[in-house]
Structures are given as C-alpha cells and as structure tokens.
Amino acid sequence: MASPTLTPGEPTVVYTDGACLGNPGPGGWAWAVPGDAYASGAEARTTNQRMEVHAALEAVLSIDGPVEIVSDSTYVVNCFRDRWWEKWEANGWLGAGKKPVTNRDLWERLIAETRRHDVVWHKVRGHSGDVMNERVDALARAAIATLSPRG
C-alpha cells in the first residue's frame, strides 16, 4: 500500500467498498484514493454490510487529517448523514424493532474514529461508471480471491 499524498487543510477523498460472495460468505473490503494509495482485505465468512463498514473504518484509520468518504453503501452513508448512530447509542445499541444493531463492534470503532477526524460522507451510485467506485469494487473482489479455498 502506498501512502496517499495529502494537501494540508484539504480533505483526502477516499473511496470505499465491500463485497461478498454469498451473504454470508467470503467477503472483501477496500479503500482507495485517486492515484496509487489503497488497501484491501478479506474475511472467510462475513456479510456485504460488514465489509462496507470495515472498508470505511480502515480508510479512516489509515488517513491523517480531514477525510471525505465516498461510498456506494446506503447503510454506511446514511448512518452518519441521518445520525442513526446517535439513536443507537441512546437506545443501548438497539435499532429498529428493538433488535441489537448488527455489526456493533465495527460501528463503535468507526464512530470513535469519526469523532477524532473531520469526516464528510458522500453517496455514489454503485456500478454507475464512476471510475474510483469501480476500482474499489474490483479491489474488494480481488481481496476475496486471495482467500484459500476450503478443501
């Protein structure tokens, strides 16, 4: 992974994506900035939403300074745009229907990191021809391919 070039005072634009073969199934996550900086990873059994949150978390952990996250995940973007997380915390991490919030472990870490960073969230339509969104989708899928098949 190369380090992104940062412009002081300007947010670093980071694209994130998660992918899953089956749901649950093997999954991958990725983040990338325009240029060469990116990171990706995979888990043997996970969900697409978990990988989307994981991608955003890894991006925020990896970039110093203000960050602009661009994601095709309504789940991730709306959590911050609509401040779902505030309701989750106030309700003891219970969501709709008084059910426990899924992926709480990742959400808690991501929320903590966004409190330490200046993060802006943007939604991009998936598979719409956005070059960077297509790039992180390909990186997330390539990460899945690195998993050893079960014998």
Model region roles, listed by residue range:
Residues 1-50, 54, 58-66, 141-148:
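RNase H-like nuclease fold core
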Residues 44-47, 98-103, 151:
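Short C-terminal domain-edge/linker segments immediately following a structured domain
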